[in-house]
From Swiss-Prot:
The entry's keywords: mRNA processing, mRNA splicing, Nucleus, Phosphoprotein, Repeat
Gene this chain is encoded by: Prp39
The protein's name: Pre-mRNA-processing factor 39
First and last residues of every HAT repeat: 393-425, 427-459, 463-498, 685-717, 719-751, 757-793, 1029-1066
Reported function: Involved in pre-mRNA splicing.
Positions carrying Phosphoserine: 122, 148, 158, 252, 308, 313
Bias type Low complexity, positions: 967-978
Gene3D superfamilies noted in UniProt: Tetratricopeptide repeat domain (1.25.40.10)
InterPro entries per the UniProt record, alphabetical: HAT, TPR-like_helical_dom_sf
SUPFAM superfamilies: TPR-like
Residue stretches of biased makeup (Basic and acidic residues): 274-301, 318-358, 575-602, 957-966
């Protein structure tokens, strides 16, 4: 064997005789290939043949330099060698060696590495002759083994096994090599594989070798496998497709790596088939090993693999044995196994779907959603979210994001376009149309969105002319009056013009020229070009052409009649002149005649007229006759068209008529165009002031808001309802976040109550304002509820109030409105439920007391249940014992009984005054009430006297408390720091619960608080001044103010009026 680290360059000069001079028969080479090998060795070698197909033999790259060397050295050889060399090169297959320094295991030749030697002289060639026999033998073996033995490539996995096989082959061939060397015709030198290291093999030409063509050689024998049944390709099991996960990426065949197909035509077909089977089995096992080990083992066992070690004998294939075993099993077990397999597959599919959902969930989606959920008005956060989902492949996440965003900002027409384009990319046309319809309903004045939608319609329904035209008509009806709708009109005209439907184009221009738009001049110029460049019969309607034609002939007839009458007048005047001239001529003629007579008489000339006279008379006659003929011809021509021309026959139009019809058609539109120009001029300044006609969350400038208000006032003053509504819609797109413009539109629509369809318009405006753009404005919701209640839609009104109550809780005005709506519709049980709900849910004692008072009145006056009203007030008083208003309301309800219960009223007063924390002023107040009540309704004088004593004691204590408060340093500092007098506790507490709790309980109906916001300083019942809190001096004669109490400064005197003063609360 050759030493390691050397390269081998072996030449296989075709299949030839093994002797050096005489050609052996082709059959002599057959035993040296495979017939001497055992069946076991054949099986192993067949496996190696399959591996040999994967080796890349770079024949072309190595063949060129050696061919060049042979060609350069050929002139130095003898002629017999030149002829032999050229014949050999046609059959030689060059086996390239690996690069220098490659290990023996990576060599491409099975007999080890041999150094590459070059011969430069003829002596080297002579030395080569002595080694011709051995070279021929080795080259033949190399050529044979190229088809029967695997070549060792750089990527083989079992190099050691292959090396041992190759060494075994060489050792088995040593006897033959010795016999060949001992023969007479062989060379004297021993040629073995080791000696080739010193030999020159660059020009390995063998002189005595007979060249045999490949057709004369026997076919390569196929490796035989003992006890193997021959089967066709159809009988072999097909490679089963691996079960890939659902999220596996689909790639095309172009993206797959190129396969190395270096197999020659002489390679056997059977190893290829087995290799394909083995590769399919290996790929299936590799892909399914992680998730389906059990199923993979079953599938791989069914494939036939001759090289795999099995415990079964070679008498039968494993697949056949398995079939026999399966046939022996009962059919029921087979069915059960199949069912179990199906169930397992279903479970695996379900698990894979769940895993796929979890896996497909976008990683950063929650981060973007968190930003907009925390602040739904964060427009920038919404844009980031939509940009993120638009770039991902999760359709459900994208739909959810777009739907939520557009529910908050439906006037962003650009995102409707993006949403529709996203659905179009997904290939779902139905969803794309739904998105377009939703967008056009939300923002019908978006010209760009309409154009985008119409392009989509034309691309999908281009053949349906009727449908496309209906969509264009729908578009111009929705936003055709918009001042900047020129692009839409131009697109409509262009579409009709492409199909050469010029009469429809003229009809569109008739509508467009009457609308003030930004490109009004261009539209009229285009219309003129259309009329002048095409025949009037295809541009104008037949009725219009016939009418204009009749007008033309009528004008011509009137012109002819006028010209004939003028001609008559001219002819009459000219006839008079002619008569005078004729008279003069006659006189001249008479004179001439006399002279002629005299001459004839004198001369004796002939008788008759001269030629001049005859000519003159003929000229006069001819003049008269021509005048008559012209008059008759003109009158005939004028009467002929009216009598004989068929105006409906447009084929008889002449050039003069066509010119007249065009001029008249254009002039008629020019009048409309002039009116449009004036309308555009009046609106141009307002249109120039609109700097942002689209929607955005950023606030508008004051100049922009003022311009919109002035523009709306201008259109309202003009009185065109359709144009006013279009302008309002344009304004609301740019000013959607300003509720004043919504209110302005509602007030305008309320002025149109007598007109039809106004109710639906008002309801739609309320819906958009309250549900979309201003969902947290109570004022708009209260107005909407009142509108629906006026339309007798109590259910809708209650729903509106319930929604705003949930969004803006703890608003007393909303609570009262909800209760009263239910009361007006007669749902008294619902009223009780709402009263109890609000009383129990409120945390403010003052608000709870106010609600309890109203609830008691409701029970007394509406439900006629006074005892239930007293019970409600009693519960409220127990919750807030210091609430003066609740106690006074209880006294009032007791007084409204048919028979006043003295004991009941006195108990209420005594219980309230018996509190330990009662203020002196409040105690004085209730003592006064008790005295007044007993004076009017008391049954005994003793009770009245006791009440008077209690009042005097209360006044004394109140006076002492007043002096202490006035004499305290803090009191002096506070009084000196303030400009005006400080009201006492009695004044501040008059009918106001004596504290700040009630001050928070109020709500304000005034216009100063447009959203009925509940402020801490807004009192439910505004605190009264001392003059308002004091009673009138009805009982001044009682003298309760004496003793200096009434003389106190600051208006803190107790001038008590009649007890019924708290009736002012009703």
């Amino acid at each position: 064997m050759a030493s390691e680290g050397e390269n081998v360059v072996m030449e296989s000069p075709g299949r030839r005789t093994r002797s050096g001079r005489k050609a052996a028969s082709p059959a002599a080479s057959l035993p040296t290939r495979s017939t001497r090998r055992t069946s076991k060795r054949n099986v192993q070698l067949s496996d190696h043949e399959e591996e040999a197909e994967e080796q890349v033999v770079m024949v072309q790259e190595e063949e060129e330099p050696f061919r060049g060397t042979n060609t350069a050295e050929a002139p130095a050889l003898e002629p017999q060698f030149e002829e032999t060399q050229h014949q050999i090169e046609d059959d030689v297959e060059m086996l390239p060696a690996e690069a220098a320094g490659v290990d023996e295991k990576s060599s491409s030749f099975p007999f080890g590495t041999v150094a590459e030697l070059h011969s430069e002289t003829s002596d080297d060639i002579k030395e080569t002759r002595g080694q011709a026999g051995v070279d021929t033998l080795l080259a033949s073996l190399a050529g044979d083994n190229a088809n029967s033995l695997p070549s060792v490539g750089g990527n083989d996995e079992s190099d050691n096994v292959k090396k041992a096989d190759f060494e075994y082959n060489v050792d088995s061939l040593q006897p033959q090599m010795e016999k060949m060397n001992s023969s007479e015709d062989s060379s004297s030198q021993h040629a073995i594989a080791e000696d080739l290291a010193d030999a020159d093999t660059s020009n390995a030409t063998i002189v005595n070798t007979e060249i045999v063509s490949e057709d004369e050689l026997p076919l390569p024998s196929k490796p035989e496998i003992n006890d193997a049944e021959e089967v066709s390709d159809e009988e072999l099991p097909a490679p089963q497709r691996a079960e890939l996960p659902e999220d596996a990426e689909v790639i095309s065949e172009d993206e797959l790596p190129a396969s190395n197909n270096n197999n020659t035509a002489t390679e056997p077909k059977a190893p290829l088939k087995r290799k394909a089977e083995n590769e399919s089995v290996k790929s299936t096992e590799d892909k399914d090993a992680s998730s389906h080990e059990s199923s993979t083992k079953d599938k791989s066992s069914e494939q036939y693999n001759p090289g795999s070690p099995t415990s079964e004998s070679n008498d039968a294939q494993p697949s056949e044995k398995k079939l026999k075993v399966e046939e022996s099993e009962p059919k029921e077990k087979k069915k059960e196994k199949e069912r179990d397999k199906d169930k397992e597959k279903d479970k695996d599919k379900d698990n894979n779907k769940d895993k796929e959902k979890e896996r497909k969930k976008l990683p950063d989606l929650d981060k973007y959603w968190r930003a907009v959920k925390e602040d739904s008005t964060d427009f920038t956060g919404w844009t980031y979210l939509l940009q993120y989902v638009d770039n991902e492949s999760d359709a459900e996440a994208a739909r959810e994001a777009y739907d939520t965003f557009l529910s908050h900002y439906p006037y962003c027409y650009g995102y409707w376009r993006k949403y529709a384009d996203y659905e179009k990319r997904k290939g779902i046309k139905a969803n794309c149309y739904k998105v377009f319809e939703r967008g056009l309903e939300a923002i019908p004045l978006s010209v760009d969105l309409w154009i985008h939608y119409l392009m989509h319609v034309k691309s999908n329904h281009g053949d349906d002319e009727t449908f496309v035209r209906s969509q264009y008509e729908r578009a111009v009806k929705a936003c055709g009056l918009e001042f900047r709708s020129d692009k839409l009109w131009d697109a409509y005209i262009r579409w009709e013009n492409e199909s050469k439907r010029y009469h429809r184009v003229v009809q569109i221009y008739d509508r467009l020229l009457a609308i003030p738009t930004q490109g009004y001049n261009g539209h009229f110029d285009n219309f003129q070009d259309l009329i002048n460049q095409h025949d009037v019969t295809i541009t104008l309607a037949n009725e219009e052409v016939i009418r204009l034609r009749k007008d033309f002939h009528e004008r011509q007839q009137s012109k002819s009649s006028k010209s004939s009458s003028k001609h008559r007048r001219d002819s009459s005047s000219s006839s008079k002149d002619k008569d005078s001239k004729e008279r003069e001529r006659e006189k001249d003629k008479d004179k001439d005649k006399d002279k002629d007579k005299e001459k004839r008489e004198t001369v004796g000339g002939g008788v008759g007229k001269s030629p001049k006279d005859t000519s003159e008379t003929q000229v006069d006659e001819s003049d008269s006759t021509t005048d008559l003929t012209t008059e008759s011809e003109s009158s005939h021509a004028a009467s002929k068209p009216a009598m004989q021309i068929d105006f409906s026959d447009l084929s008889t139009l002449n050039d003069e008529e066509v010119v007249s019809i065009r001029d008249r058609a254009i002039s008629a539109r020019r009048k409309v165009h002039k009116l449009t120009v004036s309308a555009v001029t009046a609106r141009w300044s307002f249109e120039e002031g609109i700097k942002r006609p689209y929607f955005h969350v950023k606030p508008l400038e004051r100049a922009q808001l003022k311009n919109w208000k002035d523009y709306l006032d201008f259109e309202i003053e003009k009185g065109d309802r359709e144009r006013v509504l279009v302008l309002f819609e344009r304004c609301l797109i740019a000013c959607a976040l300003y509720d004043e413009f919504w209110l302005k539109m509602l007030r305008y629509l309320e002025s149109l109550e007598d007109q039809s369809g106004v109710v639906d318009l008002v309801r739609d405006v309320y819906r958009r304002a309250c549900r979309i753009h201003h969902p947290d404005k109570p004022s708009l919701h209260l107005m909407w509820a009142a509108f629906e209640e006026c339309q007798m839609n109590f259910d809708d009104a209650a729903e509106i109030l319930q929604r705003i109550d949930q969004r803006c809780p703890n608003l007393l005005q909303l609570s009262y409105r909800r209760i009263n709506v239910e009361r007006r519709r007669g749902a008294l049980d619902k009223c009780r439920e709402l009263y109890k709900h609000y009383i129990e849910s409120t945390k403010n004692k003052g608000i709870a007391g106010s609600l309890a008072i109203k609830y008691a009145r409701f029970l007394n006056k509406i439900c006629h249940d006074l005892d239930a009203g007293l019970a409600a007030l009693q519960q409220a008083l127990e919750r807030d014992p210091a609430n003066t208003r609740v106690a006074l309301q209880m006294i009032d309800l007791c007084l409204q009984r048919p028979k006043v219960d003295e004991q009941e009223v006195v108990e209420i007063m005594d219980k309230f005054m018996a509190r330990a924390d009662i203020e002196p002023d409040q105690k004085v107040l209730f003592a006064q009430r008790k005295v007044e009540f007993l004076e009017d309704f008391g049954s005994t004088a003793r009770g009245l006297q006791d009440a008077q004593r209690a009042l005097q004691q209360a006044l004394t204590k109140a006076k002492e408390a007043q002096k202490k408060s006035d004499g305290s340093p803090s009191r002096k500092n506070s009084s000196s720091s303030k400009e005006g007098p400080v009201p006492t506790g009695s004044a501040a507490a008059a009918y106001n619960n004596g504290g700040s709790a009630a001050a928070v309980a109020g709500y304000n109906y005034g216009a100063a608080n447009p959203y009925y916001g509940q402020q801490n300083t807004a009192a439910a019942y505004p605190s009264q001044t001392p003059q308002q809190a004091s009673y009138d001096s009805y009982y001044n004669q009682w003298g309760y103010g004496s003793g200096g109490a009434s003389a106190n400064s600051g208006g803190s005197g107790y001038n008590y009026g009649q007890w019924s003063g708290y009736g002012n609360y009703y």
